[in-house]
């Protein structure tokens, strides 16, 4: 029984050390806005009272003595305890690495992508599976905007050799699942190829849809033209300058329904498009006027349009109808947008006050391209996406962090980094 108790205490001590050392570690501290602020307040010292408010640590223990005893057993020498035993800090002898090209390259070579976890898997289960696979600096569980685990993670090993050794094992399984394991560079190269392929497919699909739409438009136009063969009647002569389309409607109102009239006031000729055979409408109108069909008291030459001339005239009329429809549609869209002068409104009702509701946050996400991490600070859980906070003036212990980027950015831009406030689901 005593041995079991000792083992449980040892396991707890290990978990406490790992969790706190993660908070102050190379990966998290530069990205943790809240903890960076705390570090600046007292020469790097952070009260244990503050630390136990962090979610994952508080689940392990909130007892100061247990935390201190665990940290004393750590062999990393990353953390220091103050004389009063109420505060801890990252040792000044172990400053954060400088964010230069060497560090970025090292980060890339230490990073590994793994896919194949069931989406119900939690961080503790992943950490347990990775226990015997080398020291790991960070585990990033990739999630959707809806906070659903995608089944894939990015690991950052402590060393390049650790990552290389992990990549050499191509037969890794999680429970019964075969795992897809890629280096970070391989992953981004694969995503780039997929994007190129998708772009090519989308382009081909767009071209096909455009061609189909064009064909449908041509078929519709051809059908429309066929339905209107024999429906055009041209009129010309010394027309009265006040002749209007209304005069033509009046002239044929009981003899043939008119669909469209291509005519402007003052012109000497025009074309009438009937919804029926134009010859029938003309014959009826002539018969009703003793074969002397005049327009506003003026003699008119009436001609049926046929052949190529008919096709050209129909095409022109169809285009005119469409243009008129588009203009009318545009006017209707603006019809009720304003009142009075300048469209500002002249009604007497009081204007509604719009309450400012804060800055709107938008997230870019796609199923495989973007990640979002939930991060937690004491007393408050927030969601952060595509945000990076650089070091504040005088912050010797917090170098700037790489910018977080979506996976559709260039692979060589560096590691995907979130501005987090510490843990909740991702370490």
From Swiss-Prot:
This is Lupus La protein homolog B. Residues 365-376 have a biased composition (Acidic residues). The keyword Chloroplast does not apply. A motif (Nuclear localization signal) lies at residues 315-331. GO terms for molecular function: mRNA binding. Residues 226-348 form the xRRM domain. It is found in: Nucleus. Residues 405-427 have a biased composition (Basic and acidic residues). Residues 6-98 form the HTH La-type RNA-binding domain. Residues 193-220, 319-427 are annotated as: Disordered. La protein plays a role in the transcription of RNA polymerase III. It is most probably a transcription termination factor. Binds to the 3' termini of virtually all nascent polymerase III transcripts. Pfam families: La, RRM_1, RRM_3. One of its GO terms (biological process) is positive regulation of translation. PANTHER family: LUPUS LA PROTEIN HOMOLOG, LUPUS LA PROTEIN-RELATED. There are two forms of La, LaA and LaB, in Xenopus. Residues 327-342, 351-360 have a biased composition (Basic residues). GO terms for cellular component: cytoplasmic stress granule; cytosol; nucleus; ribonucleoprotein complex. Residues 110-202 form the RRM domain. Keywords: Nucleus, Phosphoprotein, RNA-binding. Phosphorylated.
